[in-house]
């Protein structure tokens, strides 16, 4: 199966919305442009920083309320700031985005987000007007792309997800019959040297960040949160970080409080660096899932993950690969987890090669074809939740895959009662470096 990444233009009701957002040579009402030499003006509006060089700075009007769409103003502003400038979204101001935006043209531009960028929750509009990706039927409000893009500030990118949570309750993203597609909060596609620093990402309808066909992407000091005001409709699939075909992905000094994967690079992500990551109520720091699509080679390799805290979750350090009748193949290689602190976590360490929820008999009949090699779990410590009894690590290799050079070093994991945890492993060539019990 060959994956394509094309806008879902076939579902657009008309072309009117895209025409409305063509850039204009006329300056919209309320917009201002400040010269790089106007130090007093830049300081007055909050665009002068010791950490960053001054730039030509553009401001746009803010929204009067949650239905006052400033998409056209935003597009004008970022075009005006492109090629060496900065778009400032001011502290204490709200900027509502109600139309899809193609921001794939960026070159040497900064966006200083000190206010709030908030998407409308017009579900019918977004389900017909979006950017679509074949991979797990993903859609997005917008897409960012280009070279040398920096997004920074102390503001909030708000996905306004509550309506999406309510209407998706009881459904599953990987259900083949699912047609209720939910937008990803931030997508970078065909981007090189894009960084996100300091902002909060709030209540994404689906995944929070999705990086596609990109190189040298970094996130630093970001806070990601997803919560629901409806106890019967919790956020689902709000992963912190997902990636596809990315070389060079860095996440540092970041806090994630959501209900799904904290960090989970997907197929063909290489050269990964994670440091000082805090995850609460998540499915862990996962490599994968990979091997989902028939005949497709997937790779995740060269990852270094250090100083991670994982609280109150299903998994800690996890490797996951698909099994089943019509799946792909690949490898997870050269992955290091070091200094990983877990508390109240069901599976602190896990290799899952029967993903996604594949019944045991089907997994046995159609095992995963993803090789897992050169993996180190070092200084993983803390407590399990007790959900799996005294098992704190489970590493079970597919009979159709190679699993070798997988080592556990300095593991200190206990049950909630303080008893030493048990490591379960099967099919690992050469052992794992600690005492290990068979799953049978």
From Swiss-Prot:
Coiled-coil blocks: none
Residues making up the signal peptide according to the UniProt record: 1-20
Entry-linked Gene3D superfamilies: Single-stranded right-handed beta-helix, Pectin lyase-like (2.160.20.10)
Compartments where found: Secreted
Domain of life per record: Eukaryota
Membrane-spanning parts: none
Chain positions carrying an annotated carbohydrate: 65, 190, 230, 268, 280, 307, 334, 371, 412
Pfam families reported for this sequence: Glyco_hydro_28
Cellular component GO terms, alphabetical: extracellular region
Molecular function per GO: galacturan 1,4-alpha-galacturonidase activity; polygalacturonase activity
Reaction(s) catalysed (UniProt annotation): [(1->4)-alpha-D-galacturonosyl](n) + H2O = alpha-D-galacturonate + [(1->4)-alpha-D-galacturonosyl](n-1)
InterPro entries per record: Glyco_hydro_28 (IPR000743), Pectin_lyas_fold (IPR012334), Pectin_lyase_fold/virulence (IPR011050)
Disulfide bonds: 262-279, 397-403
Keyword Signal: yes
Residues annotated as catalytic: 260, 283
Keyword Cytoplasm set for record: no
Key words of the record: Cell wall biogenesis/degradation, Disulfide bond, Glycoprotein, Glycosidase, Hydrolase, Repeat, Secreted, Signal
Broad class of where this protein is predominantly found: secreted
GO BP term (any one): cell wall organization
EC number(s) reported in the record: 3.2.1.67
Purpose: Specific in hydrolyzing the terminal glycosidic bond of polygalacturonic acid and oligogalacturonates.
Stated family: Belongs to the glycosyl hydrolase 28 family.
Protein's recorded name: Probable exopolygalacturonase B
Species this chain originates from: Emericella nidulans (strain FGSC A4 / ATCC 38163 / CBS 112.46 / NRRL 194 / M139)
Organism placement in taxonomy: Eukaryota, Fungi, Dikarya, Ascomycota, Pezizomycotina
Gene it is expressed from: pgxB
């Amino acid at each position: 199966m060959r994956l394509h990444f094309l806008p879902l233009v076939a579902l657009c009701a008309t072309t009117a919305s895209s025409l409305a957002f063509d850039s204009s040579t006329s300056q919209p009402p309320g917009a201002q442009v400040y010269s790089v030499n106007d130090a007093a003006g830049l300081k007055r509006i909050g665009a002068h920083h010791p950490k960053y060089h001054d730039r030509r700075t553009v401001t746009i009007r803010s929204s009067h309320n949650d239905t006052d769409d400033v998409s056209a103003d935003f597009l004008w502003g970022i075009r005006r700031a492109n090629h060496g400038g900065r778009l400032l979204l001011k502290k204490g101001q709200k900027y509502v985005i109600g139309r899809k935006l193609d921001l794939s043209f960026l070159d040497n531009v900064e966006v200083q987000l000190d206010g709030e960028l908030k998407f409308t929750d017009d579900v019918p509009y977004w389900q017909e007007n979006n950017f679509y990706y074949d991979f797990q039927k993903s859609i997005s409000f917008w897409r960012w792309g280009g070279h040398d893009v920096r997004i920074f500030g102390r503001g909030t990118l708000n996905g306004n997800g509550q309506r999406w949570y309510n209407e998706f309750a009881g459904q599953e993203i990987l259900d083949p019959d699912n047609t209720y597609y939910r937008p990803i909060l931030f997508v970078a596609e065909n981007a090189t040297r894009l960084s996100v620093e300091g902002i909060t990402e709030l209540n994404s309808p689906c995944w929070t960040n999705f990086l596609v066909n990109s190189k040298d992407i970094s996130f630093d000091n970001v806070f990601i949160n997803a919560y629901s005001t409806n106890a019967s409709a919790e956020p689902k699939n709000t992963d912190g970080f997902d990636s596809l075909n990315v070389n060079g992905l860095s996440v540092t000094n970041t806090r994630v409080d959501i209900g799904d994967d904290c960090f989970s690079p997907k197929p063909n992500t290489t050269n990964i660096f994670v440091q000082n990551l805090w995850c609460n109520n998540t499915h862990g720091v996962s490599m994968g899932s990979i091997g989902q699509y028939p005949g497709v080679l997937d790779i995740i390799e060269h990852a270094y993950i250090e100083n991670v805290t994982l609280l109150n979750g299903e998994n800690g350090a996890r490797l996951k690969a698909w099994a089943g009748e019509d799946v792909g193949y690949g490898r997870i290689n050269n992955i290091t987890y070091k200094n990983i602190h877990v508390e109240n976590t069901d599976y602190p360490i896990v290799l899952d090669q029967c993903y996604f929820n594949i019944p045991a008999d089907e997994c046995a009949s159609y095992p995963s074809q993803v090789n897992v090699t050169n993996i180190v779990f070092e200084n993983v410590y803390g407590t399990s939740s007790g959900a799996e009894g005294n098992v704190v690590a489970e590493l079970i290799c597919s009979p159709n895959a190679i699993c070798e050079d997988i080592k556990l070093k300095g593991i200190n994991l206990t049950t909630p009662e303080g008893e030493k945890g048990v490591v379960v492993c099967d099919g690992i060539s050469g052992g794992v470096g600690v005492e290990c019990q068979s799953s049978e």
